[in-house]
A protein has these predicted regions:
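Glycine-rich beta-strand-to-loop/alpha-helix junction loops that act as flexible
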Residues: 187-189
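Short loop-to-alpha-helix "cap/lid" segments that border enzyme active sites
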Residues: 116-125, 137-139, 151-155, 165-184
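Glycine/Thr-rich beta-alpha phosphate-binding loop at enzyme active sites
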Residues: 99-112, 146-174
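Short secondary-structure boundary segments
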Residues: 53, 72, 105, 136, ...
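Alpha-helix N-cap and loop-to-helix initiation/capping positions
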Residues: 29-33, 81-88, 111-115, 166-174
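Hydrophobic, well-structured mid-protein blocks that either form specific transmembrane helices
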Residues: 93-137
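Conserved N-terminal beta1-alpha1 strand-loop-helix module at the mouth
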Residues: 1-95, 126-132, 140-147
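Receiver (REC) domain switch/active-site residues of two-component response regulators
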Residues: 47, 65, 99, 151, ...
Length: 189
Protein backbone atom coordinates (compact mmCIF):
# COMPACT_ATOMS: atom_id res chain seq x y z
CA UNK A 1 0.00 0.00 0.00
CA UNK A 2 1.39 3.40 -0.88
CA UNK A 3 2.01 5.99 1.83
CA UNK A 4 -0.86 8.34 0.95
CA UNK A 5 -3.35 5.47 0.64
CA UNK A 6 -2.34 4.23 4.09
CA UNK A 7 -2.68 7.74 5.54
CA UNK A 8 -6.14 8.04 3.98
CA UNK A 9 -7.23 4.61 5.23
CA UNK A 10 -6.39 5.21 8.88
CA UNK A 11 -7.20 8.93 9.17
CA UNK A 12 -9.81 9.54 11.84
CA UNK A 13 -10.27 5.83 12.57
CA UNK A 14 -9.59 3.48 15.43
CA UNK A 15 -6.37 1.45 15.53
CA UNK A 16 -6.75 -1.47 17.92
CA UNK A 17 -3.84 -2.84 19.92
CA UNK A 18 -3.78 -6.65 19.76
CA UNK A 19 -0.88 -7.75 21.92
CA UNK A 20 -0.20 -9.86 24.99
CA UNK A 21 3.09 -10.33 26.80
CA UNK A 22 4.17 -13.72 28.15
CA UNK A 23 2.92 -12.99 31.67
CA UNK A 24 -0.54 -11.84 30.51
CA UNK A 25 -3.70 -14.00 30.31
CA UNK A 26 -4.21 -13.81 26.52
CA UNK A 27 -0.69 -14.96 25.73
CA UNK A 28 -0.27 -18.51 24.44
CA UNK A 29 2.98 -20.18 23.49
CA UNK A 30 1.68 -21.22 20.05
CA UNK A 31 -0.08 -17.92 19.31
CA UNK A 32 -3.44 -17.78 17.61
CA UNK A 33 -5.23 -15.50 20.07
CA UNK A 34 -4.06 -12.14 18.70
CA UNK A 35 -5.26 -12.89 15.13
CA UNK A 36 -8.70 -13.64 16.59
CA UNK A 37 -8.64 -10.31 18.41
CA UNK A 38 -7.59 -8.62 15.17
CA UNK A 39 -10.48 -10.28 13.30
CA UNK A 40 -12.91 -9.05 15.95
CA UNK A 41 -11.44 -5.55 15.71
CA UNK A 42 -11.71 -5.58 11.90
CA UNK A 43 -15.32 -6.78 12.06
CA UNK A 44 -16.03 -3.92 14.47
CA UNK A 45 -14.65 -1.27 12.11
CA UNK A 46 -11.01 -0.87 13.14
CA UNK A 47 -8.84 0.78 10.48
CA UNK A 48 -5.57 -0.74 11.69
CA UNK A 49 -3.93 -3.05 14.22
CA UNK A 50 -0.96 -2.49 16.53
CA UNK A 51 0.84 -5.73 17.36
CA UNK A 52 3.92 -7.02 19.18
CA UNK A 53 6.28 -9.81 18.04
CA UNK A 54 7.01 -11.19 14.61
CA UNK A 55 4.90 -14.28 15.33
CA UNK A 56 1.76 -12.32 16.21
CA UNK A 57 2.26 -9.79 13.41
CA UNK A 58 2.66 -12.56 10.84
CA UNK A 59 -0.45 -14.36 12.10
CA UNK A 60 -2.46 -11.12 12.17
CA UNK A 61 -1.44 -10.17 8.62
CA UNK A 62 -2.68 -13.59 7.47
CA UNK A 63 -6.00 -13.08 9.29
CA UNK A 64 -6.99 -9.50 8.39
CA UNK A 65 -6.48 -7.07 5.55
CA UNK A 66 -5.65 -4.04 7.68
CA UNK A 67 -2.44 -2.03 8.08
CA UNK A 68 -0.34 -3.29 10.98
CA UNK A 69 1.79 -1.12 13.24
CA UNK A 70 4.49 -3.51 14.40
CA UNK A 71 6.65 -3.40 17.51
CA UNK A 72 8.92 -5.66 19.48
CA UNK A 73 8.73 -5.07 23.23
CA UNK A 74 11.84 -6.16 25.09
CA UNK A 75 13.50 -4.93 28.27
CA UNK A 76 17.15 -3.92 28.09
CA UNK A 77 19.43 -3.52 31.08
CA UNK A 78 20.55 0.03 31.75
CA UNK A 79 17.84 1.80 29.75
CA UNK A 80 14.12 2.44 30.13
CA UNK A 81 13.73 1.84 26.38
CA UNK A 82 11.63 -1.22 25.49
CA UNK A 83 9.73 -0.59 22.21
CA UNK A 84 11.73 -1.65 19.13
CA UNK A 85 15.09 -0.59 20.52
CA UNK A 86 17.64 -2.21 18.17
CA UNK A 87 18.30 -2.44 14.44
CA UNK A 88 18.04 -6.24 14.75
CA UNK A 89 14.42 -5.80 15.84
CA UNK A 90 13.83 -3.33 13.00
CA UNK A 91 15.22 -5.86 10.50
CA UNK A 92 12.86 -8.54 11.87
CA UNK A 93 9.83 -6.26 11.64
CA UNK A 94 10.63 -5.13 8.12
CA UNK A 95 11.16 -8.76 7.06
CA UNK A 96 7.70 -9.75 8.33
CA UNK A 97 6.07 -6.94 6.37
CA UNK A 98 4.84 -4.43 8.92
CA UNK A 99 3.09 -1.49 7.31
CA UNK A 100 4.25 0.93 10.00
CA UNK A 101 7.28 0.20 12.17
CA UNK A 102 6.99 1.78 15.63
CA UNK A 103 9.97 2.66 17.81
CA UNK A 104 10.26 4.29 21.20
CA UNK A 105 10.86 7.98 20.58
CA UNK A 106 11.46 9.18 24.12
CA UNK A 107 14.47 11.11 25.36
CA UNK A 108 16.26 8.16 27.00
CA UNK A 109 19.26 6.74 25.18
CA UNK A 110 19.26 3.31 23.56
CA UNK A 111 21.70 0.62 24.77
CA UNK A 112 24.15 1.69 22.02
CA UNK A 113 24.01 5.31 23.22
CA UNK A 114 21.98 6.66 20.30
CA UNK A 115 19.04 9.02 20.58
CA UNK A 116 15.61 8.28 19.13
CA UNK A 117 16.26 10.77 16.32
CA UNK A 118 19.58 9.11 15.44
CA UNK A 119 17.89 5.70 15.44
CA UNK A 120 15.09 6.90 13.15
CA UNK A 121 17.65 8.43 10.78
CA UNK A 122 19.49 5.08 10.67
CA UNK A 123 16.24 3.21 9.97
CA UNK A 124 15.31 5.61 7.16
CA UNK A 125 18.81 5.31 5.67
CA UNK A 126 18.55 1.51 5.65
CA UNK A 127 14.84 1.29 4.73
CA UNK A 128 13.88 4.57 3.02
CA UNK A 129 10.39 3.38 2.02
CA UNK A 130 9.46 1.95 5.42
CA UNK A 131 6.88 4.01 7.30
CA UNK A 132 8.10 4.75 10.83
CA UNK A 133 6.15 5.77 13.91
CA UNK A 134 7.81 7.28 16.99
CA UNK A 135 6.13 6.52 20.32
CA UNK A 136 6.68 9.77 22.23
CA UNK A 137 5.77 11.39 25.53
CA UNK A 138 6.46 15.09 24.92
CA UNK A 139 6.04 17.64 22.16
CA UNK A 140 9.81 18.12 21.94
CA UNK A 141 10.34 14.38 21.42
CA UNK A 142 7.65 14.31 18.74
CA UNK A 143 9.16 17.21 16.83
CA UNK A 144 12.70 15.77 17.05
CA UNK A 145 11.52 12.37 15.80
CA UNK A 146 9.48 13.90 12.97
CA UNK A 147 12.44 16.02 11.92
CA UNK A 148 14.56 12.84 11.88
CA UNK A 149 12.13 11.19 9.46
CA UNK A 150 9.30 9.64 11.48
CA UNK A 151 6.16 9.56 9.34
CA UNK A 152 3.91 9.28 12.41
CA UNK A 153 4.25 10.40 16.01
CA UNK A 154 2.20 8.60 18.63
CA UNK A 155 1.32 9.78 22.11
CA UNK A 156 1.98 6.21 23.29
CA UNK A 157 4.55 7.04 25.96
CA UNK A 158 2.75 10.00 27.57
CA UNK A 159 2.52 9.24 31.28
CA UNK A 160 5.13 6.47 31.11
CA UNK A 161 8.32 8.54 31.34
CA UNK A 162 9.79 10.45 34.30
CA UNK A 163 9.01 13.74 32.51
CA UNK A 164 5.34 12.86 32.06
CA UNK A 165 4.47 10.84 35.17
CA UNK A 166 0.99 11.72 36.35
CA UNK A 167 -0.29 12.51 32.84
CA UNK A 168 -2.70 9.58 32.95
CA UNK A 169 -5.83 11.23 31.61
CA UNK A 170 -6.56 11.87 27.97
CA UNK A 171 -4.89 15.23 27.35
CA UNK A 172 -6.61 16.85 24.39
CA UNK A 173 -4.61 20.06 24.84
CA UNK A 174 -1.38 18.06 24.47
CA UNK A 175 -2.68 16.25 21.38
CA UNK A 176 -3.82 19.55 19.84
CA UNK A 177 -0.49 21.28 20.53
CA UNK A 178 1.45 18.29 19.18
CA UNK A 179 -0.63 18.26 16.00
CA UNK A 180 -0.05 21.99 15.54
CA UNK A 181 3.74 21.89 16.07
CA UNK A 182 4.80 18.48 14.76
CA UNK A 183 5.28 17.96 11.01
CA UNK A 184 4.44 14.22 11.19
CA UNK A 185 0.96 12.68 11.25
CA UNK A 186 -0.26 12.17 14.82
CA UNK A 187 -1.66 8.92 16.19
CA UNK A 188 -3.31 9.70 19.53
CA UNK A 189 -3.71 7.06 22.21
Amino acid sequence: MDKQALFDQIKGGLIVSCQALEHEPLYTKEGGVMPLMAKAAAQSGAVGIRANTVRDITQIKEAVDLPVIGIIKKDYEGTPMYITVTMKEVDELVACGVDILAVQGTSALRPDGSTAAQFIEAIKAKYPEQLVMADCATIEEGIACANAGADFVGTTMRGYTPETQGCDDIDFDFIHELSEKCPAKIIAE
